Amino acid sequence: MDPSGLDTRTAERFETYLDTIGVTLRDKRQRASFATYATGLLGDGSRKSMEPMAARASADPALTSAIHHRLIHFLGSSAWKDAPVRTAAARYAVDELERHGPISTWIIDDTGFLKQGKRSPGVQRQYTGSAGKRANCQIGVSLVLANERAEIPVDFKLYIPQSWADDRKRCRAAHIPDDVGGESKWELALDMIESAVETELPRGVVLADSAYGHNGGFRERLDELGLDFAVDIKSNASVRRVGSNGRLGKPTSVKALARRHVSKFKDATWREGTKGPLRGRVLRMRVVTADSQYRKQSKPMWLLIEWPEGEENPRNYVLSNLKEKMPLEEMLNICGNRWRIERSYQDLKGQLGLDHYEGRSFVGWHHHVSVALVCYAFLAAERARSFSPCGTVTHAGRALEDAA
């Protein structure tokens, strides 16, 4: 979306929006650089790194160089905090999204940032779903809020592996603070969730894959925060089935439990995903976890298993503390909302240059991501405005989608 090509009202909203978010920055030079950078990320051009954005900002070579250096300073050296900027953007978008329905889910996942060299903070050979294999990359963990209509990414943290944390010289070269590094991805996710709770963003059911949900400490902390969750666990997770009389069965893996009750799976169809309606055979039962390390989770929870027709093994195992009387269809719809985080990654990378940052600074990476989140929040709010209460897209909304 090229800001210069917006209709008058949308352009005015964009300018006012930048002013609103800019209040969280310390001085007018930061606010000016912030506006330039945000306009560059939202603007035309296939490459959203600093040099080409500076070139598009001015046809004068001398001025282009000055803009480029100003943007480098803004991202890498200027002292401003990411959290207030991200929170202000999240509130702006959430206010508009909730006109069309309450926030219903908080989605946790991570995405890869492919790299060539070894000096970008956190880079190493590691698995990323972005490539579908191990690759030289950085990993960013994110939190996305979503309702029935749309999604808004509100926070991101760069994963710094233990191999980096053990090399403080390397960390200092990448401007990684001394107290950062070695945290697991699920711990980074909890940091973001706790911040969202503290800033009183509207709550939703926490969704996550097994990289997060399999960890008992992750689930226990969600429960302590008073958050509902429906998270994937691995097939070797040990549980005890709760019988109709309340008695507990022997500890067994969820995979073995699925095979023991294969005749009880039922066909189900739930909401649209990225590739159309989601269908599968599912089984739901009450269980307690058999992990003695997390005794607080000894209360009954739902185990939801998906086993597609014709496949040798079940595909997903979901553990949830959602209410006991929740209808199966409602639970399936909630769990099916996790695909929205993938769409946010597609838009952040495809439209807003999320993975175009070429600097080698931990602070710079987070500053770049913050401005990308600000831009996404504006787009999300504009898209929400383009829908009438009955769910039809207005002419202005179609124009905005075409321009995006």
Predicted regions located by residue number:
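Hydrophobic, well-ordered secondary-structure elements that form the walls
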Residues: 342, 374
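Generic structural signal for hydrophobic core residues of well-folded globular domains
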Residues: 41-45, 57, 75-78, 322, ...
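Active-site-adjacent bridging/hinge elements
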Residues: 118, 345-352
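An anionic, glycine-rich sequence signature occurring as long contiguous blocks
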Residues: 149-174, 178, 230-340
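Conserved nucleotidyltransferase catalytic core and NTase-mimicking acidic/glycine-rich helix/loop elements
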Residues: 379-404
